[in-house]
Regions:
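Alpha-helical transmembrane segments
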Residues: 10-14, 132
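Alpha-helical cap/lid subdomain in secreted, periplasmic
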Residues: 81-208
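Short histidine/acidic/glycine/proline-rich micro-motifs that form metal-
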Residues: 38-41, 45, 71-75, 103-106, ...
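Extracellular glycan-modifying ectodomains
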Residues: 2, 21, 206-207
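C-terminal motif of bacterial Sec signal peptides marking the signal peptidase cleavage site
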Residues: 16-18
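Short, well-ordered coil/turn elements that cap or connect secondary structure elements
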Residues: 14, 60-62, 127, 161
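Serine-esterase "nucleophile elbow" of acetyl-processing enzymes
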Residues: 20-73, 79, 83-92
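Sec-dependent signal peptide recognition
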Residues: 3-10
Length: 208
Protein backbone atom coordinates (compact mmCIF):
# COMPACT_ATOMS: atom_id res chain seq x y z
CA UNK A 1 0.00 0.00 0.00
CA UNK A 2 2.84 2.39 0.89
CA UNK A 3 4.57 1.60 -2.41
CA UNK A 4 1.39 2.42 -4.34
CA UNK A 5 1.00 5.74 -2.49
CA UNK A 6 4.62 6.62 -3.17
CA UNK A 7 4.16 5.77 -6.83
CA UNK A 8 1.06 7.97 -7.08
CA UNK A 9 2.90 10.86 -5.38
CA UNK A 10 5.78 10.44 -7.82
CA UNK A 11 3.40 10.56 -10.81
CA UNK A 12 1.71 13.72 -9.48
CA UNK A 13 5.03 15.49 -8.88
CA UNK A 14 6.33 14.46 -12.30
CA UNK A 15 3.15 15.71 -13.99
CA UNK A 16 3.31 19.08 -12.22
CA UNK A 17 6.96 19.58 -13.14
CA UNK A 18 6.31 18.56 -16.72
CA UNK A 19 3.36 20.96 -17.00
CA UNK A 20 5.41 23.84 -15.59
CA UNK A 21 8.06 23.24 -18.25
CA UNK A 22 5.44 23.17 -20.98
CA UNK A 23 3.87 26.39 -19.67
CA UNK A 24 7.17 28.20 -20.19
CA UNK A 25 7.42 27.15 -23.84
CA UNK A 26 6.62 29.96 -26.28
CA UNK A 27 5.67 30.14 -29.94
CA UNK A 28 8.24 32.15 -31.87
CA UNK A 29 7.63 33.41 -35.40
CA UNK A 30 9.50 36.70 -35.14
CA UNK A 31 12.63 37.86 -33.32
CA UNK A 32 14.09 41.33 -32.84
CA UNK A 33 17.76 41.96 -32.14
CA UNK A 34 18.07 45.12 -30.06
CA UNK A 35 21.67 46.00 -29.32
CA UNK A 36 24.80 47.84 -30.37
CA UNK A 37 27.68 47.21 -32.80
CA UNK A 38 28.15 43.67 -31.48
CA UNK A 39 24.76 42.84 -33.01
CA UNK A 40 24.43 45.45 -35.76
CA UNK A 41 26.94 43.91 -38.17
CA UNK A 42 29.73 46.43 -37.73
CA UNK A 43 32.49 45.90 -40.32
CA UNK A 44 30.58 43.13 -42.10
CA UNK A 45 28.59 42.92 -45.31
CA UNK A 46 24.83 42.60 -44.86
CA UNK A 47 24.73 38.86 -45.52
CA UNK A 48 27.16 38.36 -42.62
CA UNK A 49 25.05 40.26 -40.09
CA UNK A 50 23.88 38.34 -37.03
CA UNK A 51 20.22 38.65 -38.01
CA UNK A 52 20.87 37.00 -41.38
CA UNK A 53 23.06 34.21 -39.97
CA UNK A 54 20.68 33.46 -37.09
CA UNK A 55 17.69 33.30 -39.41
CA UNK A 56 19.55 30.86 -41.69
CA UNK A 57 20.73 28.73 -38.77
CA UNK A 58 17.20 28.44 -37.41
CA UNK A 59 15.88 27.54 -40.86
CA UNK A 60 18.49 24.78 -41.23
CA UNK A 61 17.09 23.29 -38.03
CA UNK A 62 13.56 23.45 -39.40
CA UNK A 63 12.36 26.72 -37.86
CA UNK A 64 11.02 29.42 -40.15
CA UNK A 65 11.49 32.54 -38.02
CA UNK A 66 11.87 36.11 -39.21
CA UNK A 67 14.81 37.82 -37.50
CA UNK A 68 14.84 41.63 -37.62
CA UNK A 69 17.67 43.88 -36.47
CA UNK A 70 17.27 47.25 -34.77
CA UNK A 71 20.79 47.37 -33.37
CA UNK A 72 22.86 50.54 -33.81
CA UNK A 73 26.62 50.82 -33.49
CA UNK A 74 27.68 53.00 -30.58
CA UNK A 75 24.38 52.78 -28.73
CA UNK A 76 24.42 52.94 -24.96
CA UNK A 77 21.51 51.76 -22.85
CA UNK A 78 20.35 55.40 -22.72
CA UNK A 79 20.31 55.57 -26.53
CA UNK A 80 18.37 52.32 -26.68
CA UNK A 81 15.84 53.57 -24.17
CA UNK A 82 15.31 56.77 -26.16
CA UNK A 83 14.40 54.94 -29.35
CA UNK A 84 12.70 51.75 -28.23
CA UNK A 85 9.15 53.15 -28.12
CA UNK A 86 9.35 54.15 -31.80
CA UNK A 87 10.38 50.64 -32.80
CA UNK A 88 7.16 49.21 -31.41
CA UNK A 89 4.79 51.86 -32.81
CA UNK A 90 3.51 49.50 -35.51
CA UNK A 91 5.40 46.26 -34.88
CA UNK A 92 5.42 43.53 -32.27
CA UNK A 93 7.75 40.56 -31.95
CA UNK A 94 7.48 37.22 -30.22
CA UNK A 95 10.98 37.51 -28.79
CA UNK A 96 13.27 40.50 -28.24
CA UNK A 97 16.97 39.77 -27.74
CA UNK A 98 18.59 42.60 -25.77
CA UNK A 99 22.32 43.16 -26.31
CA UNK A 100 23.10 46.52 -24.75
CA UNK A 101 25.61 47.61 -22.12
CA UNK A 102 29.02 47.24 -23.76
CA UNK A 103 29.26 50.93 -24.69
CA UNK A 104 28.17 51.95 -21.20
CA UNK A 105 31.11 49.99 -19.87
CA UNK A 106 33.56 51.41 -22.42
CA UNK A 107 32.49 54.94 -21.46
CA UNK A 108 32.66 54.23 -17.75
CA UNK A 109 28.98 55.01 -17.17
CA UNK A 110 27.81 54.35 -13.62
CA UNK A 111 26.50 50.74 -13.47
CA UNK A 112 23.48 51.96 -11.49
CA UNK A 113 22.52 54.19 -14.42
CA UNK A 114 23.01 51.34 -16.89
CA UNK A 115 20.84 49.06 -14.77
CA UNK A 116 18.03 51.62 -14.49
CA UNK A 117 18.03 52.17 -18.26
CA UNK A 118 17.83 48.43 -18.88
CA UNK A 119 15.02 48.11 -16.33
CA UNK A 120 12.99 50.70 -18.23
CA UNK A 121 13.70 48.99 -21.57
CA UNK A 122 12.66 45.61 -20.15
CA UNK A 123 9.46 47.01 -18.66
CA UNK A 124 8.47 48.65 -21.95
CA UNK A 125 8.92 45.34 -23.79
CA UNK A 126 7.09 43.29 -21.16
CA UNK A 127 4.14 45.70 -21.14
CA UNK A 128 3.72 44.93 -24.83
CA UNK A 129 3.53 41.22 -23.98
CA UNK A 130 6.74 40.30 -25.77
CA UNK A 131 9.19 37.76 -24.40
CA UNK A 132 12.80 38.74 -23.72
CA UNK A 133 16.14 37.01 -24.04
CA UNK A 134 18.64 39.13 -22.11
CA UNK A 135 22.28 38.74 -23.11
CA UNK A 136 24.92 39.68 -20.57
CA UNK A 137 28.18 41.58 -20.89
CA UNK A 138 31.24 41.70 -18.65
CA UNK A 139 33.45 44.68 -17.85
CA UNK A 140 37.15 44.84 -18.52
CA UNK A 141 39.33 44.62 -15.38
CA UNK A 142 40.96 47.88 -16.51
CA UNK A 143 37.84 49.66 -15.25
CA UNK A 144 38.74 48.58 -11.74
CA UNK A 145 37.54 45.62 -9.72
CA UNK A 146 34.75 47.55 -7.95
CA UNK A 147 33.33 48.81 -11.24
CA UNK A 148 33.63 45.35 -12.80
CA UNK A 149 31.85 43.71 -9.87
CA UNK A 150 28.91 46.14 -10.05
CA UNK A 151 28.66 46.06 -13.85
CA UNK A 152 28.88 42.29 -14.20
CA UNK A 153 26.13 41.84 -11.62
CA UNK A 154 23.65 44.00 -13.57
CA UNK A 155 22.60 41.23 -15.92
CA UNK A 156 22.02 38.30 -13.53
CA UNK A 157 20.18 40.70 -11.22
CA UNK A 158 17.83 41.74 -14.04
CA UNK A 159 17.37 38.13 -15.05
CA UNK A 160 16.25 37.25 -11.52
CA UNK A 161 14.13 40.37 -10.95
CA UNK A 162 12.10 39.95 -14.14
CA UNK A 163 12.42 36.16 -14.52
CA UNK A 164 13.96 36.56 -17.98
CA UNK A 165 15.42 34.09 -20.42
CA UNK A 166 19.13 34.66 -20.08
CA UNK A 167 22.41 34.22 -21.94
CA UNK A 168 25.13 35.15 -19.40
CA UNK A 169 27.66 36.42 -21.95
CA UNK A 170 26.87 37.41 -25.54
CA UNK A 171 30.49 36.93 -26.62
CA UNK A 172 30.94 33.48 -25.08
CA UNK A 173 33.79 31.74 -26.91
CA UNK A 174 34.39 34.84 -29.04
CA UNK A 175 35.79 37.59 -26.80
CA UNK A 176 39.51 38.35 -27.21
CA UNK A 177 40.08 35.41 -29.57
CA UNK A 178 41.72 36.69 -32.80
CA UNK A 179 40.23 33.86 -34.86
CA UNK A 180 36.71 35.11 -34.13
CA UNK A 181 37.26 38.86 -34.21
CA UNK A 182 38.10 41.67 -36.57
CA UNK A 183 41.49 43.37 -36.25
CA UNK A 184 40.27 45.55 -33.36
CA UNK A 185 39.68 42.41 -31.24
CA UNK A 186 36.34 43.90 -30.20
CA UNK A 187 33.91 43.26 -33.02
CA UNK A 188 33.18 39.71 -34.19
CA UNK A 189 34.14 38.64 -37.72
CA UNK A 190 32.04 36.16 -39.68
CA UNK A 191 33.35 33.20 -37.67
CA UNK A 192 32.53 35.03 -34.46
CA UNK A 193 29.04 35.88 -35.66
CA UNK A 194 28.45 32.24 -36.57
CA UNK A 195 29.47 31.16 -33.08
CA UNK A 196 27.24 33.77 -31.44
CA UNK A 197 24.39 32.70 -33.71
CA UNK A 198 24.82 29.06 -32.77
CA UNK A 199 24.82 29.91 -29.06
CA UNK A 200 21.65 31.99 -29.45
CA UNK A 201 19.99 29.35 -31.62
CA UNK A 202 20.37 26.68 -28.96
CA UNK A 203 18.69 28.89 -26.37
CA UNK A 204 15.89 29.93 -28.74
CA UNK A 205 15.10 26.36 -29.76
CA UNK A 206 15.00 25.36 -26.10
CA UNK A 207 12.38 28.06 -25.51
CA UNK A 208 9.98 26.63 -28.08
Amino acid sequence: MIKIKNFIIFIIIFSVLNCSKEDKKIKINSILLFGDSLMSGYGLIEEEHLSKILEKDLKLDGYSINVSNESISGDTTFDGLNRIENIFLDKNYDLVIIGLGANDMLRGINPNVTKKNLEKIIEIILKKNMKILLTGMVASPTRGLEYKKKFDQIFPDLKNTYDLNFMPFLLKGVALRPKYNQSDLIHPNLLGIKLISNNLKEIIIDLM
